[in-house]
Design a protein with these regions (language model features):
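SAM-dependent methyltransferases
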Residues: 1-2, 196-198
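N-terminal Rossmann-like dinucleotide-binding module
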Residues: 1-43
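Short, surface-exposed acidic-centric catalytic microdomains
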Residues: 28-68
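Glycine/small-residue-rich loop that forms an oxyanion/phosphate-binding "nest" at active or ligand-binding sites
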Residues: 64-82
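Donor/substrate-binding cores of folate-linked one-carbon enzymes
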Residues: 84, 88-197
Length: 198
């Protein structure tokens, strides 16, 4: 059984999807043991507490350098014997030391169909705004392994959905979360935990 850490920065809707999937028995080869938040007071920590999962805060601004932040994060993960790291709306960039410690063991969910609307600065509503501004007819979500390139790791799963007339970035974001992200991320995590994806 793989010990999983979920890294978050906000409300934790993807975390909730993972917790719900686990509660339904959909990932018998993995267990969420730790939730790491990039700032205190985020609702994701409450979700963790409700599921009786330990939650901790590791803030980038508490450290003099990115390297010190990475070292603190890595220490936290190692202290909890974490095997798999899942970025679920985590807005801090992971440095090389963390990525090298977990080769093909860090997953990220991105709210667009990579290689479209990805890379530095493309998070939150921005990918949805960009898809609408470009006149795209479809969008979706991507789960990928994390490497040193922002949103550049190998793609594991993607799910597309239609962009409808009259969609706003907020409406599109909600639909992509409900129809793609909340389904894809638990599926990808279970596939990695079971060894189906290596």
């Amino acid at each position: 059984m793989l010990n999983i850490a979920v890294l978050v920065s906000g409300g934790g809707t993807n975390l909730q999807a993972l917790l719900d999937s686990e509660a339904r028995g959909e990932n018998p080869s993995g267990k969420i043991r730790l939730v790491v938040a990039s700032k205190p007071g985020v609702y994701a920590l409450e979700r963790a507490a409700n599921a009786v999962v330990e939650g901790v805060v590791v803030r980038r601004k508490d450290y003099a350098s990115s390297e010190d932040f990475d070292a603190a994060l890595l220490k936290t993960l190692k202290e909890h014997n974490i095997d798999l790291v899942v970025l679920a709306g985590f807005l801090s960039v992971l440095g090389p030391s963390v990525i090298e410690a977990y080769p093909r063991r860090i997953l990220n969910i991105h709210p667009a169909l990579i290689p479209s609307f990805c890379g530095p600065g493309m998070y939150g509503l921005r990918p949805h705004e960009a898809a609408l501004a470009r006149g795209c007819k479809v969008t979706g979500a991507t789960v990928h392994f994390v490497n040193e390139e922002c949103d550049g790791g190998p793609i594991l799963l993607q799910k597309a959905g239609d962009i409808l007339p009259g969609d706003t970035p907020e409406v599109l974001q909600k639909r992509v979360m409900e129809q793609a992200e909340w389904k894809l991320l638990p599926k990808a995590v279970a596939m990695v935990c079971s060894g189906e994806i290596k």
